[in-house]
Amino acid sequence: MLVQLEHVRKKYGSFTLELNMQIPEDRIIGLIGANGAGKSTTFKLMLGLIRSDQGTVEVLGRNAADLGAEEKLEIGAVFSDSGFSEYLKVQQLIPVMSRFYPDFQEKEFRERCERFQIPLNKQIKEFSTGMKAKLNVLLALSHGSRLLLLDEPDGGAGCGRKRRDP
C-alpha cells in the first residue's frame, strides 16, 4: 500500500476528523469536500507534519511521522503557498530544486513550463493565482515522485466556486 490510514482521529477544538483509507500504488484518489472538512489535515498527517491523536498513518510502508529524508524525496506536495519567495524568478528555482531533489528533471520541467506558458525569467510575484498554481504542480511533478499530494492545486479557488452564466 502506498498510503494507509487506519482508525485515524485528529481533533481541533470542536472539529474531529476520523478516517480509514488505503491508497494502492498507481492510483489517483481525490479528496473532495467543503472548506474545513479535513482535506488539508489529511495531507499534513500523510506528510508527517502533524500527528494523529489516535490510529496509524503509514506512507511508503513506514509510519508517516518517521519518514526520513530519503523517503520524503519520493513525495511531491502542493499546498496553497509554495513556500518559495515570490521575488524569485522561476529560473532561480531550478538550482534550488536540483539541490533538494537528486532526481530533479530539469529538461522536462523547462519543457512543461514552456507548454503551460510559465515564463522562466519572470518573478513569481508577477504571476496570476492560476499561473502560481500551475507552477506549484509542475514543481511537484518534476522529481519523479511516487506519491503526489495536491492540496488545492487550483490555487484555492475550490470545487465549490459558483458557476457564472454569460
Predicted segments, located by residue:
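ABC-family P-loop ATPase nucleotide-binding domains
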Residues: 79-136
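Conserved ABC transporter NBD signature motif
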Residues: 55-66, 70-71
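The feature captures the beta-strand-to-loop junction immediately N-terminal to the Walker
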Residues: 32-34
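Catalytic Walker B motif of ABC-type/P-loop ATPase nucleotide-binding domains
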Residues: 148-152, 157
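Helix-to-loop junction immediately C-terminal to a conserved catalytic motif
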Residues: 47
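Conserved signature/switch motifs of ABC ATPase nucleotide-binding domains
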Residues: 133, 142-145
